[in-house]
Amino acid sequence: MRIPSLLAAGVAALGLLAGSLAAPVPAAEAAPRARWLLVADPTAHAVSVADASTGRITGALPGAVLGTHAGVIQMGHGRVAFVDEAGPRLDVVDIGSSGVPRIASSTPIPAVAGAWTRAGWISDDPGHRFVAVGSDIDGSTTQQVTVVDTRRQLARTAKISTSEVTLATTGERGTEEMETFLVGSPLRLVVTAGGRLDSYDVSAILGGDANPAPVATTPFGAYPHGPVADARGTVIGSTLHDGIETVPLTRGGFGASVSRAYPEPAVQSYRPRMAPDGETAVGTQTGTGPGAPTLLTSSSMRGAGVASVALGSGASTRAVVTPGYAAAVVTAGGVDTLSLVARGRAGLYDGAVTSVRLPGLGQVQGAGSAARFLAASDDGSELFLSRAGTGSVLEIDVAGTTATVRGTIAVPSALADGGYLATVDPHQRPHDLSGR
């Protein structure tokens, strides 16, 4: 259900939005292009789907606990995949023309490497047939990956050995999160927890090899925290503590890596996304300079290009990225500021910045109250912002550098920690091979 009246009051009270944030428009005038909005509230064991054009809740997956760290993989034609931590299991979900989500397959994830805590990272292949679910077992160099063939309804789980690294945060030896990739030809499972990249034969794992040996290995930087892969699955990499490293895939293993330092002193990028061009990674990170500003950093998968743009100080959402701009919301003192960063001529998101103060909707102050989640339609015409504890999602239309608040969508739960959002369009071409 859409609630435009709350926004009208909020915009009137602000009185400072001329030229940047237009007043709400009636629903009949809006022309949203994102068909469905997936809204998850793990604390409430709730996953629902809303019609982005009307705000109507069209269906739900009762009892599902969407793993927000691993996120959602877009598989195309209205199909998504995510880990339901209530299982745990990998759910492949189809959202059809009615907006009702249907579980196409549900694959249990056995615990073979130790007590299951959560899925760390999930990924699919460029053909969007296979999915890999990696574990996140703290303090252990023995992890596991479940590989699922969604076409054959076949799944196998393998134990994977990772390495200890010198932790950038403490200087001591320890373990990091394991990242997963499904890339290359023939198809390989590539994993890293820092220190090295290991490549495994997917056909051998699906054939029953539960303790596979790597078919190729190459050195890799420490402290990876954000897997990135181009849409064709030919180059992979990660955001590290001090910069970004990418490695091309060869038939026999790996090519020469390319490393580039962050342009501004910062903590490692937080969950970068792949841009629609399939070759540019974009994420938000916290700077270490005066005021610890939020930085929006973008980098090329194929060259040395990297750029950072300061957005202001405060708690930041994950970035979203569209063909024409990247965006994030920074919250400070209870005020949400949306920043749109235009895509530059070289393909990086380092162009003009448009910042917009968003209207308040009665969110309360207190621990966790600054939690937000931002999602964008594939073409960038719409943004959706959740706010912790409000039980609603703000809708924003974007045209050029003008953002127009359209209304809010009331959702079935409070979104106590900000929840999780993803847009799903049956005509959307997937360009990101990792869960986001």
Residue ranges, per PLM feature:
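A short beta-strand motif characteristic of beta-propeller blades
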Residues: 56-63, 99-112, 154-171, 206-218, ...
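Short beta-strand elements that form the blades of beta-propeller/WD-repeat-like
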Residues: 33-41, 78-85, 127-138, 180, ...
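Short glycine/acidic-enriched loop and turn motifs that connect beta-strands
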Residues: 44-46, 86-89, 136-141, 196-197, ...
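Secretory targeting and sorting signals
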Residues: 1-30
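An edge-strand/N-cap motif at the start of beta-rich repeat modules
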Residues: 29-59, 78
